[in-house]
Design a protein with these regions (language model features):
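Cofactor-binding beta-sheet edge motifs in enzyme active sites
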Residues: 1-15, 22, 28-375
Length: 375
Protein backbone atom coordinates (compact mmCIF):
# COMPACT_ATOMS: atom_id res chain seq x y z
CA UNK A 1 0.00 0.00 0.00
CA UNK A 2 1.40 3.41 -1.00
CA UNK A 3 1.25 6.55 1.19
CA UNK A 4 -1.72 7.81 -0.84
CA UNK A 5 -3.62 4.60 -0.09
CA UNK A 6 -3.17 3.16 -3.58
CA UNK A 7 -2.54 -0.56 -3.97
CA UNK A 8 0.29 -1.50 -6.35
CA UNK A 9 -1.56 -4.78 -7.09
CA UNK A 10 1.47 -6.57 -8.41
CA UNK A 11 5.12 -5.97 -7.54
CA UNK A 12 8.23 -7.80 -8.67
CA UNK A 13 10.73 -5.43 -7.03
CA UNK A 14 12.17 -7.98 -4.60
CA UNK A 15 12.79 -10.43 -7.41
CA UNK A 16 14.32 -7.65 -9.52
CA UNK A 17 16.80 -6.76 -6.76
CA UNK A 18 17.74 -10.39 -6.17
CA UNK A 19 18.28 -11.11 -9.87
CA UNK A 20 20.29 -7.93 -10.42
CA UNK A 21 22.57 -8.71 -7.47
CA UNK A 22 23.04 -12.32 -8.55
CA UNK A 23 23.70 -11.51 -12.21
CA UNK A 24 26.38 -8.91 -11.40
CA UNK A 25 27.88 -10.58 -8.30
CA UNK A 26 27.02 -7.36 -6.50
CA UNK A 27 27.51 -8.65 -2.95
CA UNK A 28 30.95 -9.97 -3.87
CA UNK A 29 32.11 -6.75 -5.55
CA UNK A 30 30.54 -3.98 -3.46
CA UNK A 31 32.75 -2.33 -0.87
CA UNK A 32 35.92 -3.60 -2.48
CA UNK A 33 37.14 -0.68 -4.56
CA UNK A 34 39.74 -2.02 -6.92
CA UNK A 35 41.91 -1.00 -9.87
CA UNK A 36 40.04 -1.35 -13.14
CA UNK A 37 42.81 -3.64 -14.40
CA UNK A 38 46.39 -4.57 -13.62
CA UNK A 39 47.65 -1.77 -15.87
CA UNK A 40 45.00 0.87 -15.18
CA UNK A 41 47.09 2.91 -12.77
CA UNK A 42 44.96 5.49 -10.96
CA UNK A 43 41.66 4.21 -12.37
CA UNK A 44 39.36 2.67 -9.76
CA UNK A 45 36.28 0.55 -10.42
CA UNK A 46 33.10 0.55 -8.33
CA UNK A 47 29.62 -0.94 -8.40
CA UNK A 48 26.27 0.48 -7.30
CA UNK A 49 22.60 -0.45 -7.30
CA UNK A 50 19.43 1.62 -7.60
CA UNK A 51 15.71 0.90 -7.76
CA UNK A 52 12.81 2.66 -9.41
CA UNK A 53 9.06 2.62 -9.85
CA UNK A 54 6.74 4.46 -12.21
CA UNK A 55 3.08 4.81 -13.11
CA UNK A 56 1.38 3.30 -16.16
CA UNK A 57 -0.67 5.64 -18.32
CA UNK A 58 -2.03 7.96 -15.61
CA UNK A 59 -0.84 11.25 -14.21
CA UNK A 60 -3.04 13.46 -11.99
CA UNK A 61 -6.17 12.34 -13.87
CA UNK A 62 -7.26 9.30 -15.92
CA UNK A 63 -6.38 9.22 -19.62
CA UNK A 64 -8.13 7.45 -22.48
CA UNK A 65 -7.65 6.22 -26.04
CA UNK A 66 -9.98 5.17 -28.83
CA UNK A 67 -9.23 3.09 -31.93
CA UNK A 68 -10.99 1.63 -34.96
CA UNK A 69 -10.25 -1.65 -36.75
CA UNK A 70 -11.74 -2.21 -40.21
CA UNK A 71 -11.75 -5.32 -42.40
CA UNK A 72 -11.02 -4.54 -46.05
CA UNK A 73 -12.57 -6.24 -49.09
CA UNK A 74 -9.46 -8.35 -49.67
CA UNK A 75 -9.37 -9.66 -46.11
CA UNK A 76 -6.66 -7.30 -44.90
CA UNK A 77 -7.15 -4.93 -41.98
CA UNK A 78 -6.81 -1.19 -41.45
CA UNK A 79 -6.13 0.13 -37.96
CA UNK A 80 -6.91 3.76 -37.17
CA UNK A 81 -5.29 5.21 -34.07
CA UNK A 82 -4.21 8.59 -32.84
CA UNK A 83 -1.10 7.03 -31.30
CA UNK A 84 2.16 8.71 -32.23
CA UNK A 85 5.23 6.56 -32.77
CA UNK A 86 8.29 8.63 -31.85
CA UNK A 87 10.68 5.71 -32.11
CA UNK A 88 9.47 3.61 -29.20
CA UNK A 89 7.72 1.14 -31.49
CA UNK A 90 4.09 1.98 -30.73
CA UNK A 91 2.86 1.15 -34.24
CA UNK A 92 4.57 -2.24 -34.15
CA UNK A 93 3.04 -3.14 -30.78
CA UNK A 94 -0.47 -2.10 -31.83
CA UNK A 95 -0.26 -4.09 -35.07
CA UNK A 96 0.98 -7.10 -33.09
CA UNK A 97 -2.16 -6.97 -30.96
CA UNK A 98 -4.41 -6.86 -34.04
CA UNK A 99 -2.47 -9.74 -35.59
CA UNK A 100 -2.78 -11.82 -32.44
CA UNK A 101 -6.51 -11.21 -32.01
CA UNK A 102 -7.43 -11.81 -35.66
CA UNK A 103 -4.82 -14.47 -36.47
CA UNK A 104 -3.36 -12.79 -39.51
CA UNK A 105 0.18 -11.77 -40.51
CA UNK A 106 1.56 -8.33 -39.69
CA UNK A 107 1.98 -7.51 -43.39
CA UNK A 108 -1.81 -7.68 -43.81
CA UNK A 109 -2.32 -4.78 -41.40
CA UNK A 110 -2.24 -1.16 -42.56
CA UNK A 111 -2.00 1.44 -39.82
CA UNK A 112 -3.19 5.03 -40.14
CA UNK A 113 -1.80 6.87 -37.14
CA UNK A 114 -1.63 10.33 -35.61
CA UNK A 115 -3.83 12.03 -38.22
CA UNK A 116 -6.12 14.27 -36.19
CA UNK A 117 -8.46 14.70 -39.15
CA UNK A 118 -9.24 10.99 -39.47
CA UNK A 119 -8.03 9.08 -36.40
CA UNK A 120 -9.72 8.83 -32.98
CA UNK A 121 -8.46 10.52 -29.81
CA UNK A 122 -5.41 9.00 -28.14
CA UNK A 123 -3.58 9.29 -24.85
CA UNK A 124 -0.43 10.44 -26.67
CA UNK A 125 3.19 9.38 -26.33
CA UNK A 126 3.70 10.31 -22.71
CA UNK A 127 3.29 8.91 -19.18
CA UNK A 128 4.11 5.47 -20.58
CA UNK A 129 0.61 4.71 -21.77
CA UNK A 130 0.73 3.59 -25.39
CA UNK A 131 1.06 -0.16 -24.93
CA UNK A 132 -1.35 -0.36 -21.99
CA UNK A 133 -4.01 2.25 -22.78
CA UNK A 134 -3.99 2.35 -26.59
CA UNK A 135 -3.09 -1.34 -26.72
CA UNK A 136 -6.20 -2.31 -24.79
CA UNK A 137 -8.33 -0.03 -26.98
CA UNK A 138 -6.95 -1.90 -30.00
CA UNK A 139 -7.71 -5.21 -28.29
CA UNK A 140 -11.34 -4.19 -27.70
CA UNK A 141 -11.78 -3.05 -31.32
CA UNK A 142 -10.17 -6.23 -32.65
CA UNK A 143 -12.40 -8.34 -30.40
CA UNK A 144 -15.49 -6.70 -31.89
CA UNK A 145 -14.24 -7.50 -35.40
CA UNK A 146 -13.53 -11.10 -34.38
CA UNK A 147 -17.02 -11.51 -32.94
CA UNK A 148 -18.58 -10.23 -36.16
CA UNK A 149 -16.48 -12.62 -38.25
CA UNK A 150 -17.52 -15.54 -36.07
CA UNK A 151 -21.19 -14.55 -36.13
CA UNK A 152 -21.32 -14.38 -39.94
CA UNK A 153 -19.38 -17.63 -40.29
CA UNK A 154 -21.62 -19.43 -37.80
CA UNK A 155 -24.68 -18.49 -39.81
CA UNK A 156 -23.19 -19.51 -43.17
CA UNK A 157 -21.51 -22.72 -41.95
CA UNK A 158 -24.46 -23.66 -39.74
CA UNK A 159 -22.18 -24.13 -36.76
CA UNK A 160 -22.20 -22.88 -33.20
CA UNK A 161 -19.89 -20.04 -32.20
CA UNK A 162 -18.15 -22.31 -29.70
CA UNK A 163 -17.07 -24.65 -32.52
CA UNK A 164 -15.41 -21.95 -34.65
CA UNK A 165 -11.76 -20.87 -34.63
CA UNK A 166 -9.72 -18.26 -36.49
CA UNK A 167 -6.70 -19.54 -38.41
CA UNK A 168 -4.68 -18.31 -41.40
CA UNK A 169 -7.16 -15.59 -42.39
CA UNK A 170 -10.05 -18.07 -42.29
CA UNK A 171 -12.81 -18.98 -39.87
CA UNK A 172 -13.10 -22.75 -39.70
CA UNK A 173 -14.96 -25.40 -37.74
CA UNK A 174 -12.69 -26.94 -35.13
CA UNK A 175 -11.84 -30.49 -36.14
CA UNK A 176 -13.19 -29.95 -39.67
CA UNK A 177 -10.74 -27.58 -41.37
CA UNK A 178 -12.36 -28.12 -44.77
CA UNK A 179 -15.44 -26.31 -43.47
CA UNK A 180 -14.12 -22.79 -43.60
CA UNK A 181 -14.66 -19.30 -44.95
CA UNK A 182 -11.93 -16.80 -45.80
CA UNK A 183 -11.95 -13.32 -44.31
CA UNK A 184 -12.41 -11.95 -47.82
CA UNK A 185 -15.55 -14.06 -48.29
CA UNK A 186 -16.88 -13.08 -44.85
CA UNK A 187 -16.51 -9.37 -45.64
CA UNK A 188 -18.47 -9.89 -48.85
CA UNK A 189 -21.18 -11.81 -46.99
CA UNK A 190 -21.41 -9.07 -44.37
CA UNK A 191 -21.94 -6.40 -47.00
CA UNK A 192 -24.52 -8.54 -48.83
CA UNK A 193 -26.47 -9.82 -45.85
CA UNK A 194 -26.07 -7.09 -43.23
CA UNK A 195 -27.03 -3.86 -44.92
CA UNK A 196 -23.54 -3.03 -46.10
CA UNK A 197 -21.77 -3.60 -42.78
CA UNK A 198 -18.04 -3.66 -43.74
CA UNK A 199 -17.06 -5.35 -40.45
CA UNK A 200 -15.61 -2.67 -38.24
CA UNK A 201 -14.80 -2.54 -34.55
CA UNK A 202 -14.40 0.36 -32.15
CA UNK A 203 -12.32 0.21 -29.02
CA UNK A 204 -12.10 2.55 -26.05
CA UNK A 205 -9.96 2.29 -22.94
CA UNK A 206 -9.50 4.53 -19.94
CA UNK A 207 -7.05 4.26 -17.09
CA UNK A 208 -8.24 3.72 -13.51
CA UNK A 209 -11.67 2.94 -14.90
CA UNK A 210 -13.38 2.69 -11.54
CA UNK A 211 -12.35 6.18 -10.42
CA UNK A 212 -14.05 9.51 -11.14
CA UNK A 213 -12.35 12.03 -13.36
CA UNK A 214 -9.75 14.15 -11.56
CA UNK A 215 -9.72 11.91 -8.47
CA UNK A 216 -8.40 13.01 -5.11
CA UNK A 217 -6.55 16.14 -6.24
CA UNK A 218 -7.44 17.95 -3.02
CA UNK A 219 -6.37 15.15 -0.68
CA UNK A 220 -3.77 13.31 -2.83
CA UNK A 221 -5.51 10.10 -1.70
CA UNK A 222 -6.95 7.42 -3.94
CA UNK A 223 -6.13 5.42 -7.04
CA UNK A 224 -3.67 7.08 -9.41
CA UNK A 225 -2.57 4.28 -11.73
CA UNK A 226 -3.74 0.85 -12.87
CA UNK A 227 -0.32 -0.58 -12.14
CA UNK A 228 3.22 0.38 -11.27
CA UNK A 229 6.38 -0.82 -12.97
CA UNK A 230 9.39 -1.72 -10.85
CA UNK A 231 13.04 -2.21 -11.61
CA UNK A 232 16.47 -2.70 -10.10
CA UNK A 233 19.59 -1.55 -11.89
CA UNK A 234 23.27 -2.10 -11.30
CA UNK A 235 26.00 0.18 -12.66
CA UNK A 236 29.72 -0.39 -12.80
CA UNK A 237 31.89 2.70 -13.28
CA UNK A 238 35.55 3.53 -13.60
CA UNK A 239 36.93 6.70 -11.97
CA UNK A 240 40.39 8.18 -12.54
CA UNK A 241 41.46 9.54 -9.14
CA UNK A 242 44.05 11.83 -10.75
CA UNK A 243 41.85 13.51 -13.38
CA UNK A 244 38.43 12.96 -11.78
CA UNK A 245 37.09 11.57 -15.04
CA UNK A 246 34.39 8.91 -14.56
CA UNK A 247 32.69 6.67 -17.08
CA UNK A 248 29.98 4.02 -17.08
CA UNK A 249 31.28 0.66 -18.28
CA UNK A 250 28.36 -1.68 -17.54
CA UNK A 251 24.65 -1.28 -16.86
CA UNK A 252 22.30 -4.11 -15.91
CA UNK A 253 18.54 -3.58 -15.76
CA UNK A 254 16.14 -6.11 -14.25
CA UNK A 255 12.59 -4.93 -14.79
CA UNK A 256 9.04 -5.86 -13.93
CA UNK A 257 7.13 -4.28 -16.81
CA UNK A 258 4.25 -6.70 -16.90
CA UNK A 259 4.13 -8.90 -19.98
CA UNK A 260 6.64 -7.78 -22.65
CA UNK A 261 4.64 -7.96 -25.89
CA UNK A 262 7.76 -7.23 -27.92
CA UNK A 263 10.97 -8.01 -25.97
CA UNK A 264 13.18 -6.35 -28.59
CA UNK A 265 11.37 -3.04 -28.18
CA UNK A 266 11.59 -3.39 -24.40
CA UNK A 267 15.35 -3.74 -24.68
CA UNK A 268 15.44 -0.67 -26.92
CA UNK A 269 13.59 1.32 -24.27
CA UNK A 270 16.07 0.14 -21.66
CA UNK A 271 19.05 1.12 -23.79
CA UNK A 272 17.46 4.54 -24.20
CA UNK A 273 17.04 5.09 -20.47
CA UNK A 274 20.65 4.06 -19.84
CA UNK A 275 21.77 6.64 -22.40
CA UNK A 276 19.59 9.35 -20.83
CA UNK A 277 20.88 8.55 -17.35
CA UNK A 278 24.44 8.57 -18.68
CA UNK A 279 23.97 12.13 -19.90
CA UNK A 280 22.33 13.15 -16.63
CA UNK A 281 25.10 11.60 -14.57
CA UNK A 282 28.21 12.83 -16.35
CA UNK A 283 27.47 15.50 -18.96
CA UNK A 284 24.21 17.38 -19.20
CA UNK A 285 23.87 20.63 -17.25
CA UNK A 286 22.20 23.93 -18.10
CA UNK A 287 24.44 26.72 -16.84
CA UNK A 288 22.65 29.94 -15.91
CA UNK A 289 23.86 33.36 -14.82
CA UNK A 290 21.61 36.35 -14.19
CA UNK A 291 18.80 34.72 -16.13
CA UNK A 292 20.90 33.91 -19.19
CA UNK A 293 21.87 30.47 -20.47
CA UNK A 294 25.65 30.21 -20.71
CA UNK A 295 25.75 27.03 -22.79
CA UNK A 296 22.93 27.37 -25.36
CA UNK A 297 24.54 25.38 -28.20
CA UNK A 298 25.45 21.76 -28.80
CA UNK A 299 29.10 22.78 -28.64
CA UNK A 300 28.72 23.72 -24.99
CA UNK A 301 25.88 21.46 -23.82
CA UNK A 302 27.31 17.95 -23.89
CA UNK A 303 25.17 14.90 -24.59
CA UNK A 304 26.07 11.21 -24.88
CA UNK A 305 26.99 9.82 -28.28
CA UNK A 306 27.59 6.27 -29.44
CA UNK A 307 31.18 6.66 -28.21
CA UNK A 308 29.99 7.16 -24.61
CA UNK A 309 27.59 4.24 -24.39
CA UNK A 310 28.18 1.37 -22.01
CA UNK A 311 27.44 -2.33 -22.21
CA UNK A 312 23.73 -2.62 -21.40
CA UNK A 313 22.05 -5.86 -20.29
CA UNK A 314 18.33 -6.42 -19.75
CA UNK A 315 16.61 -9.16 -17.73
CA UNK A 316 12.82 -9.67 -17.61
CA UNK A 317 10.84 -10.42 -14.47
CA UNK A 318 7.33 -11.64 -15.34
CA UNK A 319 5.28 -11.95 -12.18
CA UNK A 320 2.48 -14.46 -11.71
CA UNK A 321 -0.35 -12.00 -12.30
CA UNK A 322 0.85 -11.45 -15.84
CA UNK A 323 1.53 -15.10 -16.61
CA UNK A 324 -2.06 -16.17 -16.07
CA UNK A 325 -4.92 -14.32 -17.75
CA UNK A 326 -5.44 -10.58 -18.19
CA UNK A 327 -4.22 -10.17 -21.79
CA UNK A 328 -1.79 -7.40 -22.69
CA UNK A 329 -1.38 -6.34 -19.06
CA UNK A 330 1.72 -4.36 -19.78
CA UNK A 331 3.32 -1.90 -17.40
CA UNK A 332 5.45 1.14 -17.99
CA UNK A 333 8.85 0.46 -19.50
CA UNK A 334 11.75 2.83 -20.07
CA UNK A 335 10.62 6.21 -18.80
CA UNK A 336 10.81 5.51 -15.08
CA UNK A 337 14.04 3.54 -15.14
CA UNK A 338 16.22 6.63 -15.63
CA UNK A 339 16.05 7.37 -11.90
CA UNK A 340 17.15 3.86 -10.96
CA UNK A 341 20.26 3.74 -13.13
CA UNK A 342 21.19 7.31 -12.13
CA UNK A 343 21.12 6.30 -8.47
CA UNK A 344 23.15 3.20 -9.31
CA UNK A 345 25.80 5.33 -11.03
CA UNK A 346 26.02 7.67 -8.04
CA UNK A 347 26.41 4.72 -5.69
CA UNK A 348 29.04 3.17 -7.96
CA UNK A 349 31.11 6.38 -7.93
CA UNK A 350 30.94 6.32 -4.13
CA UNK A 351 31.97 2.68 -4.07
CA UNK A 352 34.92 3.39 -6.38
CA UNK A 353 36.45 6.43 -4.67
CA UNK A 354 34.48 7.09 -1.47
CA UNK A 355 33.00 10.37 -2.70
CA UNK A 356 29.26 10.88 -2.14
CA UNK A 357 28.01 13.39 -4.73
CA UNK A 358 24.57 14.98 -4.44
CA UNK A 359 24.67 17.25 -7.50
CA UNK A 360 24.63 16.13 -11.12
CA UNK A 361 26.46 15.92 -13.39
CA UNK A 362 29.34 14.13 -11.68
CA UNK A 363 32.02 16.17 -13.42
CA UNK A 364 35.77 15.70 -12.94
CA UNK A 365 35.84 18.96 -10.99
CA UNK A 366 33.19 17.81 -8.52
CA UNK A 367 34.85 14.43 -8.07
CA UNK A 368 38.26 16.02 -7.47
CA UNK A 369 36.69 18.42 -4.97
CA UNK A 370 35.18 15.44 -3.19
CA UNK A 371 38.60 13.81 -3.09
CA UNK A 372 40.05 16.99 -1.60
CA UNK A 373 42.44 17.51 -4.51
CA UNK A 374 41.07 20.92 -5.53
CA UNK A 375 39.07 23.60 -3.76
Amino acid sequence: ILPNGDDVNNCGLTECIEKAAEHTQFNKKYGRSRPASASSGPVRRGIGIGVSSYITGSLIYPNSSSTMVKMNDDGTVTLLTGALDIGQGAETILCQIVAEELKLPMEDIEIIAADTETTPVDIGSWISGNAFVTGNAVRVASTEVREKLLSIAAEKLEASLEDLVLKDKHVQVAGSPSRNLSYQRLVALSIQKRDGDPIMGEGHWRTVRGEPYHPSLATTKGRWSDSYAFGAQVAEVEVDIETGLARLVRAVTVHDCGFPINPTLVEGQMDGQVSMALGHAFMEEVLMKEGRTLNPSWLDYRMPTIHNTAKSEVIDVITEQYEIGRPYRTKEVGEGYVSGILAAIANAVYDAVGVRLHTTPFTPERILKGLGKIK
